[in-house]
Amino acid sequence: MYKRQVIGLAPAFGTKQVKTIIDLPHDKVLREIIAGIEEEGLKWRIIKVYHTSDVSFIAHVAAEYSGSGIGIGIQSKGTTVIHQKDLPNLSNLELFSQAPLIDLDTYRKIGKNAAKYAKGESPTPVPTRNDQMARPTYQALSALLHIKETELVDNNKKPQAVTVSFQ
């Protein structure tokens, strides 16, 4: 039997910030990731990571907390990483850096792929879109959201389990 898939949330996720950079509600993002995990037959749990706002480090912590060694990290603005605990912090299995281009279907696929990695499979990476105008269009807002996220970093606070329920 496979261990639970762990999703690591950034410090502001779902509390001080409740939507991604393109206004996708955080609860819908989580629902899709969880649905993808469950479609692969795995269970999940969520932790909030307080000591960093770097999505790669958040994902690595989630991977360390996961029995399978695979974790998902999500920043409040929507940037997401699938990580493996045996990889260096700044390496990863899949990186979704252009948050303005990540839709709910992509979040579901991220959950599915993370679960497949956890089961020892080698899935085809989730297709990502590229838009040359996304960076200049969202750069200022992205920086502002990251600053607000980073203000909530607490180097002395350990990751904590998060309970979620959906209406």
Feature names for model-found ranges:
Residues 5-20, 45-47, 73:
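Short glycine-rich or small-residue beta-strand-to-loop segments that form or flank ligand, phosphate
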Residues 14-16, 21, 91-167:
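C-terminal binding/interaction regions
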Residues 30-63:
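Active-site rim loops that border cofactor/substrate pockets in soluble metabolic enzymes
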